[in-house]
């Protein structure tokens, strides 16, 4: 099956480039579109009451770092990146919204094979939310 628009969900870890390479290798033979998305935790939702942190400054800095990392992934993809998206909130809902808006038909995401990922897997959440084809790529941390 030839996909028309592949969405790569990245967490901006060093392993994200593995996902980009995998998606590009699938897109190239069919001249499919490729887009990147990163979904950030909305830190203001994690805190209740008063805190001694300037969330506005912290979120601005995180947004700048995210933009820089996405730009670097896009530039080094070796293939045209159609959309570079960044969102915050519920991972599944943000992806569903992007899929509908940009008519995407495949989501490529990674799954870190570590202790914490066994407890709280983003991939498992997406399987129950996203209604297009998915490719889940097992990732190993670079130290291993």
Swiss-Prot record:
Gene Ontology biological-process entries: response to stress
GO cellular component: cytoplasm; membrane
Protein location: Cytoplasm
Organism domain of life: Bacteria
Principal subcellular localization: cytoplasm
Keywords assigned by UniProt, alphabetized: Cytoplasm, Phosphoprotein
Pfam families: Usp (PF00582)
PTM comment text: Phosphorylated on serine or threonine in response to stasis.
InterPro entries: Rossmann-like_a/b/a_fold, Universal_stress_UspA, UspA
Induction note: During growth inhibition caused by the exhaustion of any of a variety of nutrients (carbon, nitrogen, phosphate, sulfate, required amino acid) or by the presence of a variety of toxic agents. Positively regulated by guanosine 3',5'-bisphosphate (ppGpp) and by a RecA/FtsK-dependent regulatory pathway. Negatively regulated by FadR. Also regulated by CspC and CspE.
One GO molecular-function entry: protein homodimerization activity
The protein's role, per its UniProt record: Required for resistance to DNA-damaging agents.
Protein family according to the UniProt entry: Belongs to the universal stress protein A family.
Subunit composition and interactions: Homodimer.
Protein name: Universal stress protein A
Species for this entry: Escherichia coli (strain K12)
């Amino acid at each position: 099956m030839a996909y028309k628009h592949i969405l790569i969900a990245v967490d901006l870890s060093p392993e994200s480039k593995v996902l980009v390479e995998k998606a590009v290798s699938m897109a190239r033979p069919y001249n499919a579109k490729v887009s990147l998305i990163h979904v950030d935790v909305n830190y203001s939702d994690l805190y209740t009451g008063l805190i001694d942190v300037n969330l506005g400054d912290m979120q601005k800095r995180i947004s700048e770092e995210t933009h820089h990392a996405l730009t670097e992934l896009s530039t080094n993809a070796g293939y045209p990146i159609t959309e570079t998206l960044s969102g915050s909130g519920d991972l599944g809902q943000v992806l569903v919204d992007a899929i509908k808006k940009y008519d995407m038909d495949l989501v490529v995401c990674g799954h870190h094979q570590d202790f914490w990922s066994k407890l709280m897997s983003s991939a498992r959440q997406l399987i129950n939310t996203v209604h297009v084809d998915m490719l889940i790529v097992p990732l190993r941390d670079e130290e291993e």
